[in-house]
């Protein structure tokens, strides 16, 4: 990876690498706390709901060659970065009134968020790196994104969750105890309920409102950072 550091002499690559690292800081918010968020909003099978993102990722992965020709590397990376901002804003503003379509749309954006930024970024790195250091350049990109970026991100996101959401979310989870089916489900049954949301009308409105307000505040932070 030492030889690949010389690529930082190229301003465009240096900007790309720094931006990639910075984008991965708010990315940790999504990876760490989306499941908690979905359960608090009322989704019965949060893990299954998040597979919408993986489905979207596969779909857009197949379309990358098409968009690569039509849009080019820079536009695709820019769209990917903007998609991250939009996702966090959808989560933030979908929280207070539990607007389900906004939350689902935010999850479905994963294909654009990941493929347009990260996959295209790897393709860009592979394209501009000299053949002799191509593997080192790819390793350096992983180090800056999934290494430095996510490490900082998990620390920042964890601290923010503890200071903003943790207390009110714990109160909400206690109030939600017993709501919905408690039966054990097979994997297929869990996937079939990826869109299912519990009715939270029986939950104390003050507890629910406070928790959702805190989730709104929580998701605003990564939206600002990604912007």
Which ranges hold each PLM region?
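Juxtamembrane intracellular "pre-TM" segments in multi-pass secondary transporters
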Residues: 1-17
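Helix-to-loop junctions at the C-terminal end of transmembrane segments
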Residues: 60-73, 161
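Loop-to-transmembrane helix entry/capping segments in MFS-fold secondary transporters
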Residues: 44, 129-142
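Intracellular juxtamembrane helix-capping segments at the cytosolic ends
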Residues: 116-130
